[in-house]
Amino acid sequence: MPPTEESKPVDPAQEKQAAEALASLKEAQQPAADESGSEDEGADGTAQEAGSGSTKKKNKKKSKKKNKDKSASTESSAEVGLTEALAQADPKSALSGLTPKQIQEFIDLNPALANELLAASGSSGTTDVMEAFKKLKIQDIITGLASSGKNRKDMASYKFWATQPVPQFDEKPAIFEEGPLKIQKVEDIPDEPIPLNLAPFRWVTMDLTDEKQMQEVEKLLYGHFVEDDEAMFRFKYSTSILKWSLMSPGWRKEWHVGIRSGDTLCAFIAAVPTEIRVRDKVIQGSEVNFLCIHKKLRGKRLAPVLIKEITRRINREGIWQAIYTGGIVLPRPVSTCRYYHRALNWQKLYEVGFSPCPSNSKPAFQVRKYALPEQTSTKGLRELQVKDLDAVHSLLERYLKRFDLTPVFNREETEHWLLHKKDSYAEQVIYSYVVEDASGKITDFFSFYLLESTVIRHPKHNSIRAAYMFYYATETAFTEPFDKGALTKRLNDLMADALILAKRHNFDVFNALSLMDNALFLEKQKFGPGDGQLHYYLFNYKANPIHGGVDKKNRLDEDNLSGVGFVMV
């Protein structure tokens, strides 16, 4: 579930800068559109006719006013705005209108693109790189893009993704029949690993049942997987959470793939098997995660070979589809959700620089704002037990059918993902609770999991304990006729108790995405928007877009709830 960067609550000042950058980009496009005398689509979605010079000036002023209004807004994000602006603009006018500074910003946001431009230009000179940039297609520029300098990870270049069975940006967005993009046979898949052709690197299969090898993976991820843009926080994937996420039912040792240089583990990628439901079709697939390359090796283009090798190993098992997520724009997201954060220990989050204090407020007020009751209020609320699993499995199965993109769990998987087993893990990772009514029926459940972040070089605090919203379900969703108001109230009651329980277990912040029915309770429970996005991708499967729970302005959309019901760790 975490993106490939540490999402944090939005700083209003940064949001304003992002909006201004978007406005600047749109203004840069305007003169070229005016000079061409062609029709241009206005901000209100209607075509504006290019008329006389005076009309052009009037339209230009109108455009500037709209851009000014946008720059004052704190609702847009750089990633959504810039990619949308580029994708919808006329390619020639959009690229020719960019200043050298704006081009450099795009290159800085996209390490894979930078490598391709250097190779294409045959020179490290700035002018040559700029000219190579202007020759690209819009979709090539978008591929690998990340907002605000985040995700400085090489997730493979646009040239690589153009060769893969994934939907491309330049395909028409019309409604189409969903299904596999490429049909293959196991006998056509090579037995041997993808050639590395890079001495002294070699492929290895990591045995995560071996404590030493597990610690190697943990160390690599800690140092090189996720870090926020300012290098203030770093995700700390413990042995317990790695066992939980990478050794789920049906896991295969061969799907834990590493690259060594000598004895040093310098790259890793993993997958676990999962059934994926896309609307009315169930796919035998895999969940790919933890693509990590040592920072010093990011220029070696190891990402494409890691992706090819994990794909080869999965294909050898007769599995052809996969689901994966990331904060980077790749061809082509089936859905995009936004991160939201709810402070549980606001004072600590403020001290470490995670939560900003609004300019019109004071720390003492923020502490009061996020204070929680000591006791939960839902009658019959208790921890999940083994005896509850059949009922919870049935409830979750029915609840997930309300969404378009979900996992399909069997009883064993439900137990693995939701039940804490004290004898299996050194620390508790998953926290699950049920509501039992007077008759003994399980009517609701919710869950969240632990992912700790190290606070780098802070004199007082060394870690942040973050709770991530996992799966939940309630019988209230199945009342006839459907009562959205009742569902909203029930979810708010449950999530208010989830916050209290997380606080009781010494969590500092509660994180959630805009997926499932979360839009019904996030703002009401004082979750604030984060600066992180999570894009959902399907490999070798073409699916129509699925709503991510936010509108075009990147705000929660209570009227059109998310179709995503897949929570990835």
From Swiss-Prot:
Residues 1-18 have a biased composition (Basic and acidic residues). It catalyses: N-terminal glycyl-[protein] + tetradecanoyl-CoA = N-tetradecanoylglycyl-[protein] + CoA + H(+). Its EC number is 2.3.1.97. Pfam families: NMT, NMT_C. GO terms for biological process: protein localization to membrane. GO terms for cellular component: cytosol. Residues 55-68 have a biased composition (Basic residues). The active site is at V569. One of its GO terms (molecular function) is glycylpeptide N-tetradecanoyltransferase activity. Residues 1-82 are annotated as: Disordered. Tetradecanoyl-CoA binds at Y158, K159, F160, W161, L291, C292, I293, G299, K300, R301, L302, A303. It is found in: Cytoplasm. The keyword Ligase does not apply. Keywords: Acyltransferase, Cytoplasm, Transferase. The keyword Protein transport does not apply. Monomer. Belongs to the NMT family. Adds a myristoyl group to the N-terminal glycine residue of certain cellular proteins. This is Glycylpeptide N-tetradecanoyltransferase. It comes from Neurospora crassa (strain ATCC 24698 / 74-OR23-1A / CBS 708.71 / DSM 1257 / FGSC 987).
